[in-house]
């Protein structure tokens, strides 16, 4: 029986994936390595330091350190969130439905805590989450399950009794590895991807979620 719902953040609560794309393309281009949308899509859900390390291995640059590149990307994404960030369709209604069922609500994200606070503050939903956890403090980010396991721990719920809501295959792997039930609301780049079949449930948007559907999952 489900006792909690744990949301991913980027691409689930807020349509921030385009912000990450714009920031990566701008920063990597400044380093002399033109970055494409396809490059960005290949690393959706990956923790930012691991993402930068990945591209450094493939396309090493001179000058700024990897840590400095991480900060440049984060600064740009944060600025875009504060100026343009909006809740994804159905998010507020989904939170209402989940709370009405008496389920605990948590967050498990690859983004750093500072960005989490920026997003939740921008959307005005910080008080809706009983527990927030970031892979920033984990040895490994998604697809490793620790960020989900420790988010569940903060909620006081066993992972097997949690529903994880994800938009990326990387995050979906993390949720399943944590023994959670998984709902995928796929990023547009992943629509139709056969790998998403490992999810327990799939919706095109959180706006499709309704009380009867949630009740059937909770049992």
Stretches found by the model and what they are:
Residues 20, 48, 87, 144:
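Conserved donor sugar-nucleotide recognition element shared by glycan-biosynthetic enzymes
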Residues 1-42:
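Active-site neighborhood of HAD-like aspartate-dependent phosphohydrolases
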Residues 13, 105-108, 164:
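Conserved SAM-binding loop
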Residues 1-3, 96-99, 112-219:
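Asp-based, Mg2+/Mn2+-dependent phosphohydrolase catalytic module
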Residues 21, 25, 45-53, 70, ...:
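An amphipathic alpha-helix signature
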Residues 34, 54-93, 101-103:
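Metal-dependent phosphoesterase signature
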Residues 27-28, 47-62, 119, 152:
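Helix-loop "lid/cap" segments that line or gate small-molecule binding pockets
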